Amino acid sequence: MISREMEIKIPSGLDPSTIALFIQIASQYDSSVYVEVKNKKVNAKSIMGMMSLKLQKGEDVTIVADGQDEDAAVSGVATFLGA
């Protein structure tokens, strides 16, 4: 299991269309991928879970992945959120 702390840099934050793209990226990986913010941890492949976070630009999150391609998963998801 690996994790990376980062700041969301997407100008619009994670609106529904951005979340849909995010889930497509997270779903490319076999590893379990989670997003943690404050005391909440959600499955990064769940549209309802991700929408419940209401993430905005400038928020700090932790990306966690566990599985055979965990390094690639964290890197891919973090790259998207840091765009």
Region locations from a protein language model:
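C-terminal structural segments of small proteins and small subunits
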Residues: M51-A83
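Intrinsic-disorder/low-complexity, polar/charged segments enriched in Ser/Thr/Lys/Arg/Asp/Glu/Gln
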Residues: M1-E5, D60-T62
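Aromatic-residue detector
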Residues: I2, F22, Y29, A78-F80
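Compact, glycine-rich, soluble single-domain proteins
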Residues: E7-N43, M48-L53
